[in-house]
Regions:
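Outer-membrane beta-barrel porins/channels
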Residues: 2-281
């Protein structure tokens, strides 16, 4: 009778992983990344004076700000709300199109993993009551990086005439987006099994809400090069960041089992979990 045994354990496990490396390239005669960016800036009603504002990152979407301030897109024709990409030319009839073939490449790299650390303890009391407890800590890290490159196969196809009379030609551009997230969480699991005899067995367990503290960070940047290096541009955005807490719901399990000699086992289980309790803080 009394306490018969105690067991203690520790588990460390990588329960998820992210490992991705993608690369694609080719020649495009029809469309360009910067042309698409210029089109989006035009249809969304942005203006060059807004995108060029030194404080634009405080109130404008970052992608067109990076594009405009790094020289990927610009206004034309005396309009402040009409944009053209550095890879596009404006013909005499007003048509806007890419000046010639472009070499394009896209790469994406993703790294990260989720790790669990669990300390557990169990006790046997008189072969009648069995107690168990798990204390767990989880952590994860995630890093995402993508890069789009575009370069002129023949820069002379991409003539740009500046308002001051200067003439230059587009050479290449890079657009990068980076994102990272880290987080830690903690939880507890506690359970009991009672075996009163006569083939019966009762069990109950609870899991505390899992509290996950998550921090995110992101940035984008643009770089554009021309034959006249005096017009080259590079603009990084500020680092954006955010921290929040995600709380999963409380969970409880109850079970009853009865052994029918050597014929089999009858059991019933009930789980209680209110997902409406999940919340961000």
């Amino acid at each position: 009778s009394g306490l018969k045994s105690v067991t203690v354990g520790f588990l460390m496990n990588k329960s998820a992983g992210w490992d991705e490396d993608v690369y694609a390239s080719g020649t495009n005669h029809s469309t360009s990344f910067m042309g698409a960016m210029a089109y989006e800036a035009t249809v969304n009603g942005y203006s060059g004076s807004e995108l060029g504002d030194p404080n634009a990152f405080d109130y404008m979407p970052w992608k067109p700000v990076v594009g405009y301030q790094s020289g990927m897109i610009s206004t034309f024709g005396g309009y402040d709300d009409q944009f053209v990409g550095a890879s596009e030319v404006i013909y005499d009839n007003g048509e806007v199109a890419i000046g010639g073939p472009l070499s394009q490449s896209y790469s994406r790299n993703v790294q990260g993993g989720k790790y669990d650390y669990v300390f557990n303890i169990g006790a046997d009391i008189s072969d009648f009551i069995y107690l168990g407890a798990n204390l767990g800590i989880s952590s994860f890290d995630y890093v995402y990086d993508e890069l789009f490159k575009e370069s002129a196969i023949d820069p002379s196809d991409f003539q740009i005439d500046m308002a001051n009379g200067d003439r230059m030609y587009f050479k290449d551009m890079n657009y990068r987006y980076s994102y990272s997230a880290t987080g830690t969480g903690y939880y507890g699991k506690f359970g009991v099994i009672v075996t009163p005899g006569y083939g019966f067995r009762f069990g109950a367990a609870i899991q505390t809400p899992t509290v996950n503290n998550i921090t995110e960070e992101w940035q984008m940047s643009g770089e554009t090069s021309y034959t006249d290096t005096g017009y080259n541009g590079y603009t990084p955005s500020p680092y954006g960041s955010g921290s929040y807490r995600m709380v999963s719901p409380f969970r409880a399990n109850f079970g009853l089992a009865y052994t029918l000699g050597q014929l089999g086992v009858l059991s019933a289980d009930y789980e209680m979990c209110d997902y409406g309790q999940m919340r961000y803080q």
